[in-house]
Amino acid sequence: MYIEEVKGEMNLPENVRIFDTTLRDGEQTPGVALTVEEKTGIARKLDALGVDTIEAGFPAASPGEMNSIRRIVELGLEANICGLARVLREDIDAAIDCGVDYIHTFIGTSPLHREYKLKMSPDEIIDRAVFGVEYAAEHGLKVEFSAEDATRTEFDYLVEVYRAAEDAGAEIINVPDTVGVMIPRAMNHLVSRLKEELRVPISVHCHNDFGLAVANSLAAVEAGASQVHATVNGLGERAGNAALEEVVMALITRYDLPVDIRTVELVNISEFVSKITGVRMPPNKAIVGENAFAHEAGIHVHGVLEKAETYEPITPEMVGHKRRIVLGKHTGANALRSKLQEYGIEMKEEQFCTLYEQVKRLGDKGKRITDADLRAMAVTILGKASREIVKLEGIAVMTGESVMPTATVKLRIGDEVKTTSMTGVGPVDAAINAIQSLVSETADIELDEYNIEAITGGTNALAEVFVVMSDGEGNKATGRSTREDIVMASVEAVLDAINKILSLK
């Protein structure tokens, strides 16, 4: 409604290209280091998603980086494969040796970079930029040029640098907000002015230091920028980059702009990248977070059940997500009835009231209630014995100063008894690894969360272990156990969760 009223004030491009830099800037996330196989796996996913350009890495960084980029080039993907390079002959040669068809070359231009990092005069920087762009263009590469720290560079000088790069053969001019200092109105103003000065398309690369990377990217598009740099899940240096999934969905649904992205794959690639990098997404992460389409409050759930649009701006299916009705202290009776109906569970009113009170009571205690937990509670109230599909028959653990922690576990799975031994970083890890190994033939169930808390003091303190486990079908279950023995408490909690998940099948 209100967006339509202001669209006339925007200088929107005909379409927006997505330049993905997950494999370059995203890999610079502190603590993230990807193998060749992991990088090629992500590249395949990005290509299937439909991004226009994949920045595969920084070829001059190391021989291993060059090898990764070569492997990605050899995949023969639809996307342009780009390499990052400083405006140096050796950097550009490294990119050429990798076989990329696109180069993103840069040099710092702000007073800070000129004086402290580069120790070069403004004219020297322009000369270096021109050399780099010309050298890359002469070798048949498509050239995108960035003035690093552009948003802290004097405007007249910035235009001078960009025009020189443009005249030297740059086909795209990129505006990096290198340390995320811009606000949307300022970014819009800057890009609008640059559009008046330059001939080639303008791109933006926004960092998220103040949480404004996506907003600044969209503000640039409103001013006419036709390409956005982004990363899956917003990965990147410090606070990260503009999140690809957020930029894409905003462009498509808020601006009605054509973007060649298969949006139904967004959750899939988000989870894939999260798993490979080890960077977990907050549950409330926009578009792809676990809670992006989750509803607990009774009023909200009632509205969503009547018409999803009341509390959802887009359908979860559009991005490959699922709507979830979450149970907790804010849950209303309608939500609970809907959940029971979903699982085909029928209850008398008295039984329903008992279950409803239990849900509220657990919610007030801050306990998480998964669908599998609900089903287990309902089965108990209905007087039906819950199936203990996996039962512990025996366990022995060995650990010590010079001994690899090892656990031997015997489980009864259905009518079959199985035994295995596994190692781990400690006896608890070894025991859980052994259980997962034995159960893997029945179902692919993974440990998502593990928490332990001492309830009492002393060396014989009671420990409460809480776990969250999930399978490949999106089912989650919690498990709890309280024991003096931490290993046994952990084993019982894991088996509790596993049995809840298996009971859903």
Swiss-Prot record:
Keywords: Amino-acid biosynthesis, Branched-chain amino acid biosynthesis, Leucine biosynthesis, Metal-binding, Transferase. Residues 16-265 form the Pyruvate carboxyltransferase domain. SMART domains: LeuA_dimer (SM00917). It is an enzyme of class 2 (transferase). Transmembrane segments: none annotated. The keyword Lyase does not apply. Belongs to the alpha-IPM synthase/homocitrate synthase family. Homodimer. This is Probable 2-isopropylmalate synthase. It comes from Methanothermobacter thermautotrophicus (strain ATCC 29096 / DSM 1053 / JCM 10044 / NBRC 100330 / Delta H).
